[in-house]
């Protein structure tokens, strides 16, 4: 194939700015799909992606387009996720491209994640050109948004394409711009194979399918390939492209994007960002710029029915096949039994994994409160990391604790600035700067502790700003903090699954709110139930669920007071004995209460 006729591009956009719909229009216009096969958001294969209107996994599709100059070009669209948790997926997809379409909603303007992804694209030396989407909306202000793009991102936007993916306006102009503005890939077909593995997933019939972008050389069916980070060798059983269904081709050459099926059994061997080369004719060095992704948020997942433990293990292993950024290891809890401690990139990632477990595998799960990775500095100089409150050592042997901080960029309309600043201060934030991007839009930059973000920050930010805020964050460093472990005791017994690590200043309020919430959720027993929050041996809050009372005097119509007293004493003794041996059933809502308690 003539390498000068290939264009590899991706679409960069904030959530809800119309990226997947635009991809649909490009598929339709180039004839990759007939109207009958068309379903909205074609590239979002998971139901979950379509329902939430977000793109989770990277997808690719090859489009054939005959341009105005009479030549037929091969356009490889590499669809990227737009959410902050999936930044690594975005960086891999972008590394496989030469250019990108920056899609901005003409009514909303530049949002926080648009910025983050554009900077990633510019770091990868991509040629980026702007497209203003949704120009059919009455609220669209193309001139203001063009000005915003130039001011904030610094990309020339005077000739930005005006489009409406929903109405199909501007599709041809976008395809022409792709051909004219995005450079053709460079690469020597005769050189040894050097290909970037930018996504992989597991197919139950064919094993691991890997998506590759060839930078040099060629690859055909039957070639022996090697993955350079693990040095494992495989035979390429099938090579092909997505157009948009899988189509086998005789060979892939430099500049092309396609899939390889090589009988790989484990996705952990097909690391995203790895370099694929030929076993007997290797390239000199790996492609650079890739890192192992580390989970930032941890949470315990336990089956409500303990018989589902093995099913949960299998389900997690299957999800891990498709998601190299997700980790899990077994753990046990006195209150919840056997389960797994899982690591996620962020909150959305956690919700999605959880929802997929329940939806695709039919599991009923209890989730413990999310935590982040803390560093413990012991008196003897040892330093180690902990992921849950149960791993936290006694304070006597600990010199100090450190927690991760993030740098948050929050874009909000200026009417809501006061509320957002109050929220950030409440979450122990340190203000860096406030920038007026336009007279009506403000960018607020704050340093915030990650553990304040993981619980309910995003929900509260959205409710304060009526849904208009957008948030993007990057990790800064670990900082020393006055952190304590707060335990919840039910009738004097610590419930390990409800323990939390939090800042000492917040502990009293948090404890008080949590026990009052628990009081509402725990049903009344035949005996009194004491719910306490404690730091060490000091009780900081308490609520009592009163016992149900049977009227033992009902059958005494008169008679002596001593008779009544005897019956009451007998009841009291019985309740006391019951309290010693009685167990309290904690409903699933009790564990969710931790996530939902607002720091008022």
UniProtKB/Swiss-Prot annotation:
GTP binds at residues 16-21, 133-136. The keyword Cell membrane applies. One of its GO terms (biological process) is positive regulation of translation. SUPFAM superfamilies: EF-G C-terminal domain-like, P-loop containing nucleoside triphosphate hydrolases, Translation proteins. Residues 4-186 form the tr-type G domain. It comes from the Bacteria. CDD domains: EF4_II, EF4_III, LepA, lepA_C. One of its GO terms (cellular component) is plasma membrane. It catalyses: GTP + H2O = GDP + phosphate + H(+). One of its GO terms (molecular function) is GTPase activity. Its main location: membrane. Keywords: Cell inner membrane, Cell membrane, GTP-binding, Hydrolase, Membrane, Nucleotide-binding, Protein biosynthesis. The keyword Protein biosynthesis applies. It is a peripheral membrane protein. Its EC number is 3.6.5.n1. It is an enzyme of class 3 (hydrolase). It is found in: Cell inner membrane. PANTHER family: TRANSLATION FACTOR GUF1 HOMOLOG, CHLOROPLASTIC, TRANSLATION FACTOR GUF1-RELATED. NCBIfam families: lepA, small_GTP. Required for accurate and efficient protein synthesis under certain stress conditions. May act as a fidelity factor of the translation reaction, by catalyzing a one-codon backward translocation of tRNAs on improperly translocated ribosomes. Back-translocation proceeds from a post-translocation (POST) complex to a pre-translocation (PRE) complex, thus giving elongation factor G a second chance to translocate the tRNAs correctly. Binds to ribosomes in a GTP-dependent manner. Belongs to the TRAFAC class translation factor GTPase superfamily. Classic translation factor GTPase family. LepA subfamily. This is Elongation factor 4. The gene is lepA.
